[in-house]
């Protein structure tokens, strides 16, 4: 199916269950300043960097093209990380500004985006990206540190969730999930 057909499939799924796509973003997103689905989507795209998107995959679909592949699915934390694991991810980078105390089936590095969250929920965190905003590290330095952590994690270093014994899964239900 084409990218547009896949997008229409997701939109049809929402409509068939009497839901409006624009009920997303979640209350937590709204508290953080995201007001529309477009705002949330722009944030997702920015996290992909500057590489061109080579394919849009169905939920839990496995990549067969080299490059940046986008995976269709809901923004729900546990459902999306379960889908990434089913798609074959070996390490997941999960950025959060509010903190989410869960563990996915694959090692999931929690990347905290602000110092306040790190101060209050340090045992949930794997990487503090808030050091960029505080000026403690440059973007390049933090990127290098995160890259090293990804390599260590892929080589067997446990994530914070794994050390706490958290290994939840959540399969996308037949219906709308925010």
List each language-model region with its residue ranges.
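Single conserved hydrophobic/aromatic residue that forms the stacking wall/gate
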Residues: 1-10
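Short glycine/threonine-rich loop-to-helix capping motif typified by GTGT followed
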Residues: 4, 34-42, 103-108, 171-178
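Conserved structured core elements
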Residues: 4, 74-78, 144
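Flexible, glycine/charged-enriched surface loops at secondary-structure junctions
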Residues: 14-31, 157-169
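Active-site rim loops that border cofactor/substrate pockets in soluble metabolic enzymes
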Residues: 23-79
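Hydrophobic alpha-helical bundle architecture
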Residues: 56-119, 131-135
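Extended hydrophobic packing segments that form well-structured cores
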Residues: 88-90, 95, 106, 129, ...
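Gly/His-enriched, cation/cofactor- and phosphate-binding structural elements
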Residues: 124
């Amino acid at each position: 199916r084409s990218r547009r057909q896949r997008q229409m499939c997701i939109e049809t799924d929402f409509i068939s269950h009497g839901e409006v796509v624009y009920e997303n973003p979640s209350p937590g997103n709204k508290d953080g300043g995201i007001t529309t689905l477009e705002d949330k989507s722009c944030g997702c795209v920015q996290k992909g960097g500057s590489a061109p998107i080579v394919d849009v995959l169905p939920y839990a679909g496995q990549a067969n093209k080299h490059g940046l592949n986008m995976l269709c699915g809901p923004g729900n934390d546990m459902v999306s990380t379960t889908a990434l694991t089913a798609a074959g991810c070996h390490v997941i980078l999960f950025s959060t500004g509010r903190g989410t105390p869960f563990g996915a089936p694959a090692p999931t590095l929690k990347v905290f985006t602000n110092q306040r969250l790190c101060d209050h929920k340090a045992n949930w965190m794997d990487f503090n990206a808030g050091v960029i905003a505080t000026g403690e590290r440059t973007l390049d330095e933090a990127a290098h540190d995160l890259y090293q952590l990804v390599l260590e994690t892929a080589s067997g270093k446990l994530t914070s969730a794994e050390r706490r014994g958290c290994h939840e899964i959540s399969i996308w239900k037949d219906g709308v999930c925010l």
